[in-house]
Amino acid sequence: MANKLVLISLLCVVLVAKITQAAPQYAPGDEPSYDEDTDDSDKLVENDTSITDEDYAAIEASLSETFNTAADPGRRLGEGSKP
C-alpha cells in the first residue's frame, strides 16, 4: 500500500514539473510577444442602409402571422387514429 502511495505521489510531482516547464518563461519586466494582427479593416462592410420603411412594415406584419403549423414529421398521415 505504501509503495502505491509513493508511486502516485512521485507521478504527481513529475506531472507538476512537466506543466511548469511547459509554461512560457519571462524575465521580470518582460512582456510576452503576440502574433502580429492582420489588418482586415479593408474587408469590413458598412451597415446595409438599403432597407426602407416598407421593408420594416413587411417584417412587422410577418411577425403576427401564424407559424409552425406543419404536420408533425414524426407521424405519418392516418397513423395513431383509432378506427
From Swiss-Prot:
Region listing for Blocks active site cleft of host thrombin in a reverse direction compared to substrates, in residue ranges: 72-75
Activation/inhibition comment: Increasing concentration of NaCl decreases affinity for thrombin.
Region Blocks exosite I of host thrombin: start-end pairs: 56-62
Molecular function per GO: molecular function inhibitor activity; toxin activity
Residues in the signal sequence: 1-22
UniProt keyword Methyltransferase, yes or no: no
Effect of R75K: Reduces thrombin binding. No significant effects on anticoagulant activity
Bias-annotated ranges (Basic and acidic residues): 73-83
Sugar-modified residues: N47
Disordered: region residues: 25-51, 64-83
Compartment(s) where it occurs, according to its Swiss-Prot or TrEMBL record: Secreted
Note, other: Does not inhibit host coagulation factor Xa (F10), factor IXa (F9), activated protein C (PROC), trypsin, chymotrypsin, neutrophil elastase (ELANE), papain, plasmin (PLG) and thrombin-like enzyme batroxobin from Bothrops atrox.
Family: Belongs to the anophelin family.
Physiological role: Salivary protein with anticoagulant activity that inhibits host thrombin (F2); binds to the proteinase in a reverse orientation (opposite to substrates). Inhibits thrombin-induced platelet aggregation.
Identification of the protein by name: Salivary thrombin inhibitor anophelin
Organism: Anopheles albimanus (New world malaria mosquito)
Protein's gene: AT
